[in-house]
Amino acid sequence: MKKLFTLVLLALCIAVLAPTTSKATHLAGGDITWAPTGVPNQFLVKVKLYRDCDPSAIQLPSTVEVCYSSLSLNFAATVTANIVQIIAAPVSICVNVGTNNCAQAGSPGDTEEHTYEVVINLPQQAPDWVFATQTCCRNNAITTLTNPGGAGFLIEARLNNLLAPADNSPVFATLAFSKFCVGNPFYYDQGATDADGDSLVFSLVDAEESSNFSCPYTAASLPYVSGYSGLVPLSSSVPITINPQ
């Protein structure tokens, strides 16, 4: 089975570090994954949100609301996902984002990952389940979106458990956030793996927010600064491309 795995690079999953940097004060990225629990129509849903490690950055909440909906079933509901408590470790961990970064841990651009989990019992199988969360707001340091600090942050994951009742979602193989230096060569692998061995298709999309702010969410593309889009997240002398496989 082929799965479409949309990479939400959004212009907020990439922090460009120049000699002068801006500190992030809002959300820097996120993703949603799921895995079957072994109980029919029951899935463990994980939400990961990323924020700047800087102490002045806005703190993320201890819970997030997850909407799960199916248009074909005319069904929508919300559940609360709690932040994961890890024994002998802080709830959120500041990490140095990769080995090809410009500076040491604790420098601008380092990221804090918050993981939330909730078990969702779907009422029945459907080809169009959507797991989604909407919150506010995006990183004020983003330069490719207009008014990023006032823009909502919507992420979605889509499940067809009619085709695959015990389906696993793709999972990023590496940390879903990176930073790099202007003018330096950079290689960034944001590939993913799938426990079911399904083939994956990658694509770039626009950054989104919800236009209705209620479950089920209605996705709306955010306005980009002239010259940028989901397909053109960075200015480059060579066009940005992605290998769909």
Predicted regions: what they are:
Residues 1-28:
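Bacterial Sec-dependent N-terminal signal peptides
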